[in-house]
Every structure is written in structure tokens, then in C-alpha cells.
Amino acid sequence: MFSNTSSSGTLDASGLHLPYCSGVYCYGNLFRTNTALTIAPKELPATTLTKQCYQGMFYNCTNLVTGPEVIAATTVDDQSFRIMFSGCSNLPSTPRFEIKALEGEDNCYNMFYNCTSLTDINCTLPATTLTEMCYRGMFNGCT
């Protein structure tokens, strides 16, 4: 929908409401490689995520400077956050997480890969149920 977009202007998606979606890959790649995106939706309110729900959602949005404040999910399925912010080289902070159970594999794989401007890590990673490799490479390439 908003992927692979570039323009001389900027895109502020802070007012965009993304409701619960029960399908696989619901919001996957929604803004992928959108270089106009500077402000993400303020909140991602879904509490139960389906497989690959937010995978690659902001992948390579190199001008993103304001990510979501909160990811409200408490239960997530396979690869829900895989490469979600990967390549967002101007993103200064992470969202706050409310995750209690990571019920699939590779949930946060390379989630913030190469986010070289990260200085504020807001996620406390409160999950009490973990699966194999759930946080694998989450902050790879961050300096």
C-alpha cells in the first residue's frame, strides 16, 4: 500500500489506525522501503498477532525518525516482528513492548538490524514465554 515509495515530500502516518487483522502477513511490508515516511503510526494496538503480522513493516524506511510509541501485542505468532525496522538508519528509539508470550520462531529476528542511530532502547522485553531463537539478531548492526 505505502511500500517502495519515494518523493521529495514527507509522509506522516501518525494518525493512521491499524485495527486487528486475523490473516497471515496482515501488515507485512506495509511501508517497506518508503523513503518519504518520517513518522510511523503512533500505536500498533493489536494484542494478538498472527504469523508474520508486522514482518518488514518499516523495512528500509531510511528517513523514519519517529516510530510507534507502543506495540501493544501481548501474544505473538511466528516471525511477527521479523525485520520490522531493519535498515531504519535514522530511527533514534525503539517502541515500548507489552509482549508476554513469544509463541513462534524467529519473532524478533533482525528487528532493528542496521538501525545505526538507535540511542534509546525502550523495550524491556517482558515476555515470560520464549521460543527458540526468538530474539536472534534483534540488534545486529546497531552502533
Cite the ranges covered by each PLM segment.
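Negatively charged
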Residues: 1-143
